[in-house]
């Protein structure tokens, strides 16, 4: 694998491509499908040349003589002992850089704001603001294994103004980890999934500890990558991943991005939070979880009011640290998954990964009252054959007999360790309804849509914690790429699809409501990559009929990424720094 990053990974300039303004038609099959045809007008070239993306230029810190000697010695230990140990370990596809950083998963350089982008169609006037999407984009070549989740966080931003005026930019989130590695000009922080495996992983940890001991690096200021989730709360855009505190990112008046710094909610917390906090649309409160792999309590539930003040900090008792990427809220409760992927650092001593799939473990959901102060009244309900990496919504109902029920909508993945290891089994991700009877402590799971992988999506955020009808979700086929968007009526299983077309793939769709009308009155947006023509686009789809209304040709390649959000014009004005 080539390890020379940046210039060799810049997109090649190609001739102007045809672009789509679909005239969808209904396919006569069991599900209503609106197909995007490929008869499309031609986009003109950009009116002016686009400058090459900028990169962070390493500047080396001033070391005293003893530090230089120690650093040189540790470098020799790395090259003569640690790296050979890592190279002797066969890499499965989920941690093989040749796989994880291939094609449109490869990293790109930062791109300053590019204005005056070509738009085909008309962007609705209600969409004034900035679409933000987070993703993993390693600054430096991996030294050994590399998992998709290990890359440095990079945010891609599409700013939409009046009269079809659109700009684009992308910037690294300047985490403490990235700032230190940039100063050193190389990767030095351990990659939690790609590198921390077996004895070579222990050696990598020992090497990092030694470098920290001589003052070359400092892990106390944060070791996270902030590459997964984004949320706008209390005047702040926060980028986050489960390995650290969030990072605040400023969106300036030109649509550029600037990292403000690590954000501990005004020093009210000092531990990492998960990538998917929930903002209650009714109260405005932010709910989240924080877990600690090394010590108890392994999990805490946190709540912040609209002013950003922490109003709940509740310990959740778990027998072992569990990987939790997402959770759900209802009007009165918090729904917490405790599933089969757990952390066991002792497995590294035995030559394995610290993130393991415990096949015999029974998945369960904990239901905690938002008013609970101690966590002692949490109710656990077993949910067999269930592993949900993402939960899309939850709400409260009652059975005909009057039993209280929590309804959870999530994507159930099989095998559960698909993302982390090679099981040899085909991946299935089933959009499911999970019903938790709070009187009988029994559960029932029903697959809403069969025969298609549905993962990474949005609902109308006004319905978070309340009964909803629709979810807009990526069609993850061929796995792990996404070939289109499915609008799913979760009440009756009806599906409408917007397909990107041959050799065209995207990611998580982002739903933006239009006013306060019907639940599906709004627009779905996201990035699309044409792998055959080597071009990237930003598309906007009418959520009611799943027809494309506008598309923007982007000046640079946008890699596949993770999660996004839309920051409205009013929210931009409310930013605080």
UniProtKB/Swiss-Prot annotation:
GO terms for cellular component: chloroplast stroma; chloroplast thylakoid membrane. GO terms for biological process: abscisic acid biosynthetic process; response to red light; response to red or far red light. GO terms for molecular function: 9-cis-epoxycarotenoid dioxygenase activity; metal ion binding. Its EC number is 1.13.11.51. Residues 1-25 are annotated as: Disordered. Pfam families: RPE65. Binds 1 Fe(2+) ion per subunit. Fe cation binds at residues 276, 325, 390, 563. It catalyses: a 9-cis-epoxycarotenoid + O2 = a 12'-apo-carotenal + 2-cis,4-trans-xanthoxin; 9-cis-violaxanthin + O2 = (3S,5R,6S)-5,6-epoxy-3-hydroxy-5,6-dihydro-12'-apo-beta-caroten-12'-al + 2-cis,4-trans-xanthoxin; 9'-cis-neoxanthin + O2 = (3S,5R,6R)-3,5-dihydroxy-6,7-didehydro-5,6-dihydro-12'-apo-beta-caroten-12'-al + 2-cis,4-trans-xanthoxin. It is found in: Plastid, Chloroplast stroma. Its cofactor is Fe(2+). Disruption phenotype: Plants exhibit abscisic-acid-deficient phenotypes in seeds, but not in vegetative tissues. InterPro entries: Carotenoid_Oase (IPR004294). Expressed before fertilization in male and female gametophytes, and then immediately after pollination, restricted to seed endosperm. It comes from the Eukaryota. Induction: Low induction by drought stress. Keywords: Abscisic acid biosynthesis, Chloroplast, Dioxygenase, Iron, Metal-binding, Oxidoreductase, Plastid, Transit peptide. Disulfide bonds: none annotated. The keyword Ubl conjugation does not apply. Its main location: plastid. Has a 11,12(11',12') 9-cis epoxycarotenoid cleavage activity. Catalyzes the first step of abscisic-acid biosynthesis from carotenoids. Contributes probably to abscisic acid synthesis for the induction of seed dormancy. Belongs to the carotenoid oxygenase family. This is 9-cis-epoxycarotenoid dioxygenase NCED6, chloroplastic. It comes from Arabidopsis thaliana (Mouse-ear cress).
